[in-house]
Amino acid sequence: MTGDKCEIHNCPALSDVDAAIQILRHLGCKVIRDGHTVEVDSSVITVSEIPDDLMREMRSSIVFLGAVLARTGKAEISSPGGCEIGLRPIDLHLSSMRKLGAEITEEHGRLYCSLGKSLHGADITLSFPSVGATENIMIAAAAADGTTVITNAAREPEISDLADFLNGCGAKISGAGDSTVVIEGTKRLHGTCHTVIPDRIEASSYLIAASATGGRICIKDVIPAHIGALIPVLSEAGCDITTSGRWICLSAPPRLKRVKMIRTMPYPGFPTDAQAIVGAMLSVADGTSVIIENIFESRFKHVTELMRLGAKISVEGRMAVIEGSKYLTGANVVAPDLRGGFALITAGLAANGKTVITGTQHLDRGYEAPEKVLKLLGADVRRINENDGTEKQETRQLAENIGKPAGESAEDCTDRHSQEADDRYNIRQGK
């Protein structure tokens, strides 16, 4: 959107990032990846359409709508992909773009977006504090004429992080992190360097996994305030938690206690992305716990797989009642989605015997080399190739798989993505 070079640091090696880079390259951007740094040169944009196969790679592909529309005055996209965890309509995105001046029509599953003149500021009230819609509005409005006010905006830390990035590019955004965000449009944005905030859900996942196994863990480069809704849940379960600066340390008891009630809510409430994982943890707690899922209506698909391990969980609508078991037993299970996959890892670590998880390609969307992290924490876990049973040595190859390998120019860089085998985790009890 800036027409300049932007350098993004602390960018994780995830398949969703790979997908975003593919989209940027398709649009005409030059993208160089070196480890956890990504450089994007958007000085030349050659197309304004994104093919269906690229849109379906990830849910957040929809946020390209605002950027492409602002840059080229038109956009052609389809509905995004991502995990199947329930209805996630894009109506808030489309209605917001229309308020900013876009004309949008749908034909054969494709959305055709154009501008009469240019984007203009507007007052937009969201019926739900959608993270993606808030991001899309912020991106488009940053280059619009006039002032845009978002009411009932998402308050997640990622919204504040995006505002910091856009402001670094010359945008004028205030209020990010609160329910009302004000964007004063500017004619010219420029390149910047930006460091992405730590992933709060990744940190939460490892804290929960350590809790489920009665273990101890210290995580650095985390912002404890960003996981403020999880800490009291883990404390109620009997964990001892200390924080200091960008550190958080947890020590779990041999047997967790029940957590009376957890309700997922938009930030700063308990995150829906941690719901499945904490449910796996509570399946080995002492007593009965209740989880109510208020964000997505189909986010208990992992429960059937947890029950194969011996978890005692009953689901009625958006409520799950978890009767803690003293022991789980290893089994063959299938990861239904990203967070459900890590929930199965958590349960497998706490179970007696070996657990084999297939469908783990979902994990690559949100976790960088989780098997390596778990090994560092003392888990007996291997990632193996499904086709020949050999251990997979490298989950991601940062510079080699995407971006510019050493000594190769960005212009000569070819697509180095290899077709990923269907792989799985072998997990032995991590206690």
Q: What annotation goes with each model-predicted range?
A:
Residues 1-403, 425-431:
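Short, structured segments at the rim of ligand-binding sites
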